[in-house]
């Protein structure tokens, strides 16, 4: 019987252990997509206790607590922090089999060094006091944790109207050498169907100092914001796409009419929504290509399913799930529309429904280009798939349908400074898979060859890709 979470956690063969400890473990973290608050990095937030650093904004943990029957006031409500922490401590033993159980114990080990204790209601008080003591120390501030976890870069997720004042402050601070760059997230600009679209266009116009009343003026405003983001080191643009729409792009006059209808609060048809979003996304893609940015498409979530809780808590509170809309043909035509003019940017495709893994695994091969290794990527297991089984599926299907050796690897996609252990989780799973190939005679026992592949996937490929 193996002990719980030893140094060889998830590594069942000697080859896997060598690959992880000799090649993967010490690689820096290039976290190219996350939802950290740049203000907390700029101000080097010092968290007071484990409730703050663990439970604020972490909808993974919130969902688990709700599933365990915890009352909402102990999750997102008015209860004191220690009571919320104890409610989580009571939930964790019920999470065996869920990735939260592994993540929680990995987060205790790194960065806190708590390796000899299983988190439970019985150990909660001891761990609370230990965590509180450590969190008062400078090396456990937001920046301190990033340094302890060997983070090289983080890419935050930012709206085009953001001033990027905190990114500017971080870049000008010579005492901090972790690169913190913005990522351009224009969802509210291309989703013309959103209820608050008109309000957003007004805000965008003010920030860009342009009155947006035509499609060309909208492009001008977004172009100015792209230049603003580029100035502060932006390397990527991210897009959340519940639905992948495609329609042949109409002439500018038709696009102006669609925009005017929407700005005048007139109803627009589904075909008009598709025409508008296609036109704007294709144009945005060519802009990203011009600036050498990476385009990321996160596809397939159903968001804000619970109307009552959405009204109470707003978005991103743990009430989203996996969608099942088909999108292969529309995605292919969208990418092809950019590629026809040789202006398709480097692109990472993520699906929330694992049913679509093989489809994306083959889709990326349609648009690869000489001179850019792995130009089009099948992204790491996202959201409900960034757990052991989901990561294994994505890695296996990418290796079978594409080139695993060119993969840009893991990202946290998280709002928590403790989520860097997800890179460790991924690296262990990667090394276990490759080590298993060697043990079964499916790959050569060449640690130089495989070790370089592991290092590339863990760090070097992403470092080269996002430049």
UniProtKB/Swiss-Prot annotation:
Alphabetically sorted, this entry's keywords are: Isomerase
* Record-listed E.C. numbers: 5.3.1.12
Q: Which terms does the UniProt entry file under GO BP?
A: D-galacturonate catabolic process; D-glucuronate catabolic process
Q: Does the keyword Isomerase apply?
A: yes
Entries under InterPro entries matching the protein: Metal_Hydrolase, Uronate_isomerase
Q: Which reaction does it catalyse?
A: D-glucuronate = D-fructuronate; aldehydo-D-galacturonate = keto-D-tagaturonate
Q: Pfam families in the record, alphabetically?
A: UxaC
The answer on whether this UniProt entry bears the keyword Nucleotidyltransferase reads: no
- What EC class does the entry list? isomerase
Gene Ontology MF terms: glucuronate isomerase activity
Pathway info: Carbohydrate metabolism; pentose and glucuronate interconversion
NCBIfam families recorded: PRK02925.1
Q: Which family does it belong to?
A: Belongs to the metallo-dependent hydrolases superfamily. Uronate isomerase family.
Q: What is this protein called?
A: Uronate isomerase
Native organism is Histophilus somni (strain 2336) (Haemophilus somnus)
């Amino acid at each position: 019987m193996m002990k719980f979470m030893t140094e060889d956690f998830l590594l069942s063969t000697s080859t896997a252990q060598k690959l992880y400890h000799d090649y993967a473990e010490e690689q820096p973290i290039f976290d190219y997509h996350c939802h950290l608050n740049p203000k907390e990095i700029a101000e080097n937030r010092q968290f007071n206790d484990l409730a703050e650093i663990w439970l604020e904004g972490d909808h993974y943990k919130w969902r688990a607590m709700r599933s365990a029957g915890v009352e909402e006031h102990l999750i997102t409500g008015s209860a004191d922090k220690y009571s919320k922490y104890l409610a989580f401590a009571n939930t964790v033993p019920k999470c065996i089999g869920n990735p939260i159980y592994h993540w929680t114990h990995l987060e205790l080990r790194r960065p806190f060094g708590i390796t000899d204790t299983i988190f439970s209601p019985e150990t909660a008080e001891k761990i609370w006091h230990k965590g509180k003591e450590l969190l008062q120390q400078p090396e456990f501030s937001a920046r301190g944790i990033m340094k302890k976890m060997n983070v090289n870069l983080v890419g935050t997720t930012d709206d085009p109207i953001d001033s990027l004042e905190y990114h500017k402050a971080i870049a000008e601070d010579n005492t901090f050498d972790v690169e913190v760059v913005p990522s351009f997230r224009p969802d509210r600009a291309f989703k013309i169907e959103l209820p608050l679209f008109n309000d957003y266009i007004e805000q965008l116009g003010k920030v860009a100092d342009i009155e947006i009343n035509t499609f060309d003026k909208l492009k001008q405003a977004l172009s100015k914001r792209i230049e603003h983001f580029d100035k502060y080191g932006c390397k990527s643009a991210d897009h959340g796409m519940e639905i992948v729409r495609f329609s042949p792009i109409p002439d500018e006059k038709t696009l102006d009419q669609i925009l005017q209808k929407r700005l005048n609060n007139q109803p627009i048809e589904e075909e008009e929504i598709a025409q508008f979003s296609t036109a704007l996304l294709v144009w945005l893609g060519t802009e990203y290509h011009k600036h050498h940015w990476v385009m990321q498409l996160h596809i397939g979530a159903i968001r804000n399913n619970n109307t009552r809780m959405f009204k109470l808590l707003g978005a991103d509170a743990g009430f989203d799930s996996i969608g099942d809309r088909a999108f292969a043909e529309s995605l292919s035509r969208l990418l092809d529309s950019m590629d026809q003019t040789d202006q398709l940017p480097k692109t990472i495709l993520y699906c929330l429904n694992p049913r679509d893994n093989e489809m994306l695994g083959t889709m990326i091969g349609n648009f690869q280009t000489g001179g850019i290794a792995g130009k089009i990527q099948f992204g790491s297991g996202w959201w409900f798939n960034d757990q052991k089984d989901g990561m294994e599926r994505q890695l296996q299907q990418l290796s079978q349908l594409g080139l695993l050796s060119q993969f840009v690897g893991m990202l946290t996609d998280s709002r928590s400074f403790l989520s860097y252990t997800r890179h460790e989780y991924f690296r262990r799973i990667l090394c276990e898979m490759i080590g298993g190939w060697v043990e079964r005679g499916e790959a050569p026992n060449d640690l130089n060859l495989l070790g370089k592949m592991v290092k590339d996937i863990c760090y070097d490929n992403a470092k080269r890709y996002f430049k």
